Amino acid sequence: MGEQAASGDRLFRSIAAAKPKLVTGVPDGMLAETIRLCAASNDFPYIACAREEETIGVACGAAMAGERAVVLVQNAGLLNSIGAFATMALRYQLPFVVLVTNRGVLADPNSYDIEKYMAFEASVKTLTPVFSYAAASLPDDLVPAAFKWAEAARRPAVIALEKSL
């Protein structure tokens, strides 16, 4: 199993351990294995969305109903969703987990991703804390711990998953 597949499996197991009611997201190369495993899971549905702000809406609806939801997006996708994130998730203190692939970091220096990283750093982190982890070495209890934090803080927990050197 390759490094990306192994980290995708590890992330899936952490998501499953948190027992979410649903997982929602849009396609992303770093999350491809996790998305595949979520879509095949019998424990929760994977709701594929066309736009990132739809994932925030789905998660907000679940949280309003008292259910756990996980969002899978890229940093640029969360930036696209910032209006929905601020006016729904933050305004109404809705706890859910957002797993963000943080593109453009030092170990991911594609020229087209660097601005995504800079914009993410400059905007999302002014709204809510962002907890960063190396995608290749995620703790097993990452998503359960993120839910505990989100539920205590009464706001989404944003986890930035980053490639490492």
Q: What is the role of each PLM region?
A:
Residues 1-165:
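Thiamine diphosphate
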